[in-house]
Each structure stands twice: as structure tokens, then as C-alpha cells.
């Protein structure tokens, strides 16, 4: 008698993806983040669904409805803060997942990698629109500043911005459409995740050595299911510690003031996970140049497969490239710090140097160092 798990048309797909999937025997904890991102997405969709049951997307009542959720709804405060801090956990996992891909050369699976970059854009768009929904000061002014960037597009810019706003400023129409998009995008993300996995399972997973591991595979279950459960426990522990002990740690106090179009907050800044891109945007004095730098700071990830000049896939045995990689990580931390600082000396020049270094490392230094390593190894 054949096993239902292997013959049933629907269960068979799940079996090939999560149970009998042949996985390399040596993948480290850095490979846990895919499943953790899946968990984050599920948490966000579920908490978001319950929040949407009580939220009203109207400028007059949006702020009050969030207050109502926190004060009057059973465990509403828990759902709201799980959703807000869940986004932070989502981005921590995302950045680590992308960093893993860069370090171990996973970008050579370029279909999987490019879908991943599109997913990153989609998650960033969703998070941005979600930040607008509570209709606090930072929600309103963040939406105004970021949507206004589109006016830098030649010829159609101004029309485009007014079209997105649904009027001549960020108002009721903007909030309503942002809520609609914020609701639908996670489901589009879930569909893209399926495509991401489809492409990944065409080739199989990469591993820390970067070598082909076809001759040494082990079943995903029980080995990596158990390993993933450990990651899940650590993620949930961190998230709940954040939610229950300091839920506002990563938020902005300005967002507890209802949106007021007549008073600008002293420092307009996005959530922490956008600060690196915000710093790159601000480091260029020209509006269009800044917008292009902002978009290209993420889009540049798509160039990684083309810029890979090393004869080795992974950085595991490339100490020079490792050095450059960790300088890039330090540079991103610097950009994140600068993004949260006011636009004044010395932060302006530090931001400009960090932005130049970011693009220089990816476009110039890493490929050059890769070629030097090839030469040193007489390849």
C-alpha cells in the first residue's frame, strides 16, 4: 500500500516541499531564516486581520480606532504590538536572510534571488503603508515626504503624486487606499513566496561551502524541521519579550500625537528598518538624484549575480572578500545610525561617505577583491 503523503495530489506537493525534500547535510543556522520569514508573514497576516476588524480607515477616526483597539478590545494591545513589532522581526530576518545569500553566493540561483529582491520591495512597500495607518504625526508626515519624492520624476511627477494622494495633499482618500493596499499586499507576498520556493526547489538549497551537495543529501524532516523549531522558539521568545516588556522601544513617540497638517515634527524619520535607505536618499543634495540612489540602493541587489567574478561561489574560503563583506555590514549600521540623526554637521558628511562606500563596495571593491583572490589562488 502506497503512502497517502506520497500519492495524494495536494499532500504530495507539501511532502516534496517540507518533508521528503532532499537538503544538504551541512547547512548552518543561517538557513533558518527562510522558515522564520514564513512564520513572520503568517503572524503579520493573522494579527493584521484581527486589527482590520476594529480599524477604521478614515482621517477623523483612524487614530481613535487604534486607541480603541489598545484600550477596549480584548487583548487588542497585544495584537497591535505583536503586529508593530512583528514587522521589526520580519525585517531583522529579511536582512539576515539577504546577508546570508550575499555571503554564501546564493544569488547564483538568479531566478530565486530576483524574486527575493521583488519580495523585499513588496515587504518594504507594505511596511511603509502600514506605518501610515495609525494616522499619528509621523504617519502623516512620513507619507507626505515619501510620496512627494515621486514628484522628482520628470514631466509626470506632479500629476503622479496627486494621483496617488487622490487629491492635493495626503488626506482621507490617501489613507483609504493605503489601507486597501496594505491589506492586499501580504497576500501577493504570500503568492510570490510560493514562486520563490518553486524556483528554489528547482535547484535545491545552497550550502556554506558553496560546493554541489547532490551526493550528500538528507531528508528535510525530521532533521531540519527540528532545527527550524529551535529558530521559531527563539524568534517567538524575542518577539514576545519585545511586545510584553518594551512595545514602544522601536516606535516613534511622535506617532502618539494625532496627525496635524499644520505642525511639522522637528525630525521626520521612518521606522528603523528604512533608515539606511533614508540616509542614502538624504546624502544627495539633488531631489531626483536622491530618489534614484534610494531605489538603486535596493535594486543593486539584482546585480549581484553579474558582479560575481570569483571562481568560488561562497565566501567561506575567501578571507579578503569576508573582510570587505563585514565592512559593508558595518557601513549599513553606520547608515542606519545616520538616518536617525538630524541633517547637520558632522552627520551630513558621514552619511555621504557611508553612501559612497556602500555603492563602491558592491560595484567596485568586492568584484576587484574577488579577482585578486582568483590570482592569489592561481585560478
UniProtKB/Swiss-Prot annotation:
GO BP of this protein: mitochondrial electron transport, ubiquinol to cytochrome c
Coiled coil: none
Gene3D superfamilies named among the record's database cross-references: Cytochrome Bc1 Complex, Chain C (1.20.810.10)
Domain of life of the source: Eukaryota
GO cellular component, one term: respiratory chain complex III
Binding site for heme b b566: 97, 196
Cofactor note text: Binds 2 heme b groups non-covalently.
Binding, heme b b562: 83, 182
InterPro entries cross-referenced by the UniProt entry: Cyt_b/b6_C, Cyt_b/b6_C_sf, Cyt_b/b6_N, Cytb/b6-like_sf, Cytochrome_b, Cytochrome_b_C_euk/bac, Cytochrome_b_N_euk/bac, Di-haem_cyt_TM
Requisite cofactors: heme b
Keyword Electron transport: yes
The entry's keywords: Electron transport, Heme, Iron, Membrane, Metal-binding, Mitochondrion, Mitochondrion inner membrane, Respiratory chain, Transmembrane, Transmembrane helix, Transport, Ubiquinone
Transmembrane keyword on record: yes
UniProt-annotated binding residues for a ubiquinone: 201
Main location: mitochondrion
Entry GO MF terms: metal ion binding; ubiquinol-cytochrome-c reductase activity
PROSITE patterns named in the record: CYTB_CTER, CYTB_NTER
Subcellular location, record wording: Mitochondrion inner membrane
Ranges annotated as spanning the membrane: 33-53, 77-98, 113-133, 178-198, 226-246, 288-308, 320-340, 347-367
Topology class, membrane: Multi-pass membrane protein
Quaternary structure note: The cytochrome bc1 complex contains 11 subunits: 3 respiratory subunits (MT-CYB, CYC1 and UQCRFS1), 2 core proteins (UQCRC1 and UQCRC2) and 6 low-molecular weight proteins (UQCRH/QCR6, UQCRB/QCR7, UQCRQ/QCR8, UQCR10/QCR9, UQCR11/QCR10 and a cleavage product of UQCRFS1). This cytochrome bc1 complex then forms a dimer.
Purpose of the protein: Component of the ubiquinol-cytochrome c reductase complex (complex III or cytochrome b-c1 complex) that is part of the mitochondrial respiratory chain. The b-c1 complex mediates electron transfer from ubiquinol to cytochrome c. Contributes to the generation of a proton gradient across the mitochondrial membrane that is then used for ATP synthesis.
Protein family per UniProt: Belongs to the cytochrome b family.
Record's miscellaneous remark: Heme 1 (or BL or b562) is low-potential and absorbs at about 562 nm, and heme 2 (or BH or b566) is high-potential and absorbs at about 566 nm.
Name assigned to this protein: Cytochrome b
Lineage, uppermost ranks: Eukaryota, Metazoa, Chordata, Craniata, Vertebrata
Gene: MT-CYB
